[in-house]
Amino acid sequence: MSIENLEHSLKEVREQLKNHELYAQLDSVEDIRTFMESHVYAVWDFMSLLKALQRELTCTDLPWKPASDTTVARFINEIVLEEESDFNEEGVAKSHFEMYLDAMEEVNANTSKVKGVIGNFGNLEAIAGQIKKADLNLAERNFLASLLRSSIPENRISLPRPLPLEGKN
């Protein structure tokens, strides 16, 4: 499948996302703060998923060897370049995650929680325990666990399966 075919096949889904009903429900700065304080985990996790794709579809190991599909490798690496080191409005290279944190601070959203959670993800073996211990609501914990599970090989880490939506919300 070519990049053009992929983009075409995603066009309808992209339109649905652009016109999602959630946007109409964000009526105040407080609503935006609340949304951002949970959505930030999706922004962070996107990079984890992207790095998993980069690991699988390009070569990030030593010794280096050419990727089996250099068109896909280039596409992934271009996305990684932009996500990891795009330029903000001041011309400073920052990751999109860091830019999102800056935007959160502009609207006085709480960034200390996500910085604490992500900051404790020092190694793969500690992630499951950190997710359990973190001050996250159940939906946030399940989101992180399920998406990390899809981006980290099972032989590297054991993450909890999503829990029923009850308990700490």
For each of these PLM feature ranges, what is it?
Residues R74-N169:
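Active-site-proximal alpha-helical scaffolds that flank and shape metal-associated catalytic sites
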Residues S68:
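Active-site cofactor/substrate anionic-group-binding motifs, chiefly glycine-
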